């Protein structure tokens, strides 16, 4: 867990234990249900835990928020963020049942009472959330169209709502229709080569 503590030095002993246990749990589940490429498991902390936590470096969450993770797969970025923010509610959604089973089992094993999960397609979802997070599920235009109805309306001047999207590569063309989008380079936050082209899009 040295890599996580390098960037998140205030992690509690409980959080360090949860992240450590998460590595073992995903190794165990991945041997049974392939939710992460086998080769990628060798870099699990870097490629999945720390990458997910890039959102927290760019846009920290405050207590009491509701966050929706769309297309969570095996639980990313939702599970790592839920460990970091135990007082924020996370709802993790994926259309593939076996992946949601892994999410449920991992969340239960880690004692994450702030995590709920559901097998569903995003267009069938109801409810309202402060933030929607995701990791490169589809093009931003399609993602926004499918999820915008799930964001809580802004009722007070100080309210903050939005989409926090982990993406990579050149996003100039993809984001041309979203002049209000802000792109943050994770290479400015994390020094590892893996993050050279990784970004967080805030919309």
Regions found by a protein language model. Give the residues of each.
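Conserved beta-strand signature within the Rossmann-like core of class I S-adenosyl-L-methionine
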Residues: 155-171
